[in-house]
């Protein structure tokens, strides 16, 4: 599903974020206790929705542990109050993720069916990187649910690396969500 070039492109943004050239505008920034997040967005004229990129730093977070938490669906169900339903499903030899997300009234919940892959890679400087790619896939064995909007154009990349400092500090040098577009079809 994912090519080496997909992962390489995501990892390149560690050194050279593709924001202005791609038409992203600064949206907001937040910082707390050594954690910083900068959010950029790109407007889609056709859909009227935005794509988002988030770049941030987490103090005292090991990127390998962060990647394990990111991939652990059972643990996510424990802490994420937006999870209505979340599980893996095998289809055609591939592990798919089904995720039904609670949205506040009066909005409808959204659900996603996507394939994801985690790769441990090496940066161009030789540092270890954990990269996750996720993308919507069709799945006829999980029918759409009444009152829930199926998101069929989900694309996400998450790239985690260390900041190289002594100790357990880590950096999410690039955590960007492409096409978190909540389309109804």
Q: Where are the regions that the model predicts?
A:
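Eukaryotic helix-grip
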Residues: 1-185
């Amino acid at each position: 599903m994912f090519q080496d070039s997909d992962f390489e492109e995501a990892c390149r943004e560690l050194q050279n974020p593709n924001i202005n050239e791609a038409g992203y505008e600064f949206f907001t920034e937040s910082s707390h206790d050594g954690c910083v997040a900068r959010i950029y967005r790109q407007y889609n004229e056709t859909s009227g929705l935005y794509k988002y990129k988030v770049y941030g730093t987490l103090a005292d977070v090991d990127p390998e542990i962060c990647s394990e938490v990111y991939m652990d669906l059972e643990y996510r169900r424990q802490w994420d109050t937006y999870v209505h339903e979340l599980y893996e499903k095998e289809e055609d030899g591939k592990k798919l993720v089904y995720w039904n997300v609670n949205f506040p009234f009066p909005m409808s919940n959204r659900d996603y069916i996507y394939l994801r892959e985690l790769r441990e890679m090496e940066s161009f400087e030789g540092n270890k990187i954990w990269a996750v790619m996720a993308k919507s896939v069709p799945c006829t064995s999980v029918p759409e649910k009444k009152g829930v909007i199926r998101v069929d154009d989900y694309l996400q990349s998450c790239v985690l690396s260390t900041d190289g400092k002594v100790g357990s500090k880590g950096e999410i040098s690039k955590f960007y969500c492409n096409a978190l577009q909540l389309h109804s079809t």
